[in-house]
């Protein structure tokens, strides 16, 4: 058993333990610390009486006040929903164009649309609608299926080549794999991709460009338009073929990527959000996307 020892310099007893010749003084706690400790104990006892504290199986002590953070949260959520109800009802009853003409509804729809976009759309289209490889930019004026409020609303609602009965485009279809399916030879693909490069002011072989135009007219113009203006501008419905004279490419506008695209084809799909989101939410999204900067 350790033996207490009184320190000669301070006159204070030690704890009786020694480590490498070092002894710990057995000083009492400061009075202020001790009193504060007692106050904390007293406060804890008062808290136990007034507030929820002890778990009891599947329940718990409720306290005299019967306070519940969960009930407070539910109350505040219900209050918030009640405040939003009139706006959501109005949005559900109006068209997207009508919503944009109503200053109050527009502000509410933009705020909600931003939140819905970040939660449901940003993973593919980017937080600011800047797009990514294979996912269209929503902040420019190049639209594959139309950039009006009504067009955007319909696209979000029914999707692109989705399993929705009113989807835009035909499910299971897309751009033909001209090389993989044996429709064009490697030389023809080389020529037509040089032709597309020339349309964008990029270096291309003049001899290939002339032959590539013929290949384009015979195989590509039906969807992309006679002047590569895209299906929308060419009035070709239900295709969604992009313009081929632009700066923002869906998959890339360099030679290698163009060859890959023509050889293997492309087939983008977007889900029909009407199966996951209510109509007011979809309209708010349409308003938000339309106002990202490229809406028609």
From Swiss-Prot:
UniProt-listed InterPro entries: CcoP_N, CcoP_N_sf, Cyt_c-like_dom, Cyt_c-like_dom_sf, Cyt_C_IC, Cyt_c_oxidase_cbb3_su3, Cytochrome_c_Oxidase_Subunit
Keyword Heme part of the UniProt annotation: yes
Cofactor note: Binds 2 heme C groups per subunit.
Periplasmic side: 53-296
Membrane topology: Single-pass membrane protein
Entry binding sites for heme c 1: 121, 124-125, 270
Cofactor(s) needed: heme c
Residues that span the membrane, as ranges: 32-52
GO cellular component: plasma membrane
GO biological process, one term: proton transmembrane transport
Amino-acid biosynthesis as UniProt keyword: no
Cytoplasmic side: 1-31
Cytochrome c domain mapped to chain residues: 108-200, 207-293
GO molecular function, one term: iron ion binding
Keywords, in A-Z order: Cell inner membrane, Cell membrane, Electron transport, Heme, Hydrogen ion transport, Ion transport, Iron, Membrane, Metal-binding, Oxidoreductase, Repeat, Respiratory chain, Transmembrane, Transmembrane helix, Transport
Pathway where this protein functions: Energy metabolism; oxidative phosphorylation
Subunit structure of this chain's protein: Component of the cbb3-type cytochrome c oxidase at least composed of CcoN, CcoO, CcoQ and CcoP.
Described purpose of this protein according to its UniProt entry: C-type cytochrome. Part of the cbb3-type cytochrome c oxidase complex. CcoP subunit is required for transferring electrons from donor cytochrome c via its heme groups to CcoO subunit. From there, electrons are shuttled to the catalytic binuclear center of CcoN subunit where oxygen reduction takes place. The complex also functions as a proton pump.
Similarity comment text for this entry: Belongs to the CcoP / FixP family.
Protein's recorded name: Cbb3-type cytochrome c oxidase subunit CcoP
Native source species: Azospirillum sp. (strain B510)
Lineage: Bacteria, Pseudomonadati, Pseudomonadota, Alphaproteobacteria, Rhodospirillales
Gene that encodes it: ccoP
């Amino acid at each position: 058993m350790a033996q207490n020892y009184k320190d000669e310099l301070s006159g204070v007893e030690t704890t009786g333990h020694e480590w490498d010749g070092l002894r710990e003084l057995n000083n009492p706690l400061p009075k202020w610390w001790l009193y504060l400790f007692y106050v904390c104990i007293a406060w804890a006892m008062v808290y136990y009486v007034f507030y929820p504290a002890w778990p009891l199986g599947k329940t718990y002590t409720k306290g005299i006040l019967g306070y519940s953070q969960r009930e407070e949260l539910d109350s505040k959520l219900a209050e918030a929903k009640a405040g939003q109800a009139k706006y959501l009802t109005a949005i559900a009853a109006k068209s997207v164009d009508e919503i944009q003409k109503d200053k109050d509804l527009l502000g509410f729809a933009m705020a909600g649309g931003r939140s819905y976009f970040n939660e449901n759309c940003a993973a593919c289209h980017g937080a600011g609608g800047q797009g990514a490889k294979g996912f269209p930019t929503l902040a420019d004026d190049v639209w594959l299926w139309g950039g009006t409020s009504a067009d955007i609303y319909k696209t979000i609602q029914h999707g692109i080549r989705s399993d929705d009965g009113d989807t835009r485009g035909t499910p299971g279809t897309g751009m033909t794999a001209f090389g993989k399916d044996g429709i064009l030879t490697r030389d023809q693909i080389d020529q037509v991709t040089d032709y597309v490069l020339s349309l964008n002011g990029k270096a291309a072989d003049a001899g290939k460009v002339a032959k590539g135009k013929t290949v384009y007219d015979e195989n590509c113009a039906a969807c992309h338009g006679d002047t590569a203006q895209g299906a929308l501008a060419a009035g070709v419905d239900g295709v969604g073929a992009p313009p081929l004279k632009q700066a923002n490419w869906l998959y890339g506008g360099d030679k290698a990527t163009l060859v890959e695209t023509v050889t293997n084809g492309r087939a983008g799909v977007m889900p029909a959000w009407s199966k996951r989101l209510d109509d007011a939410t979809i309209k708010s999204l349409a308003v938000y996307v339309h106002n990202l900067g490229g809406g028609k």
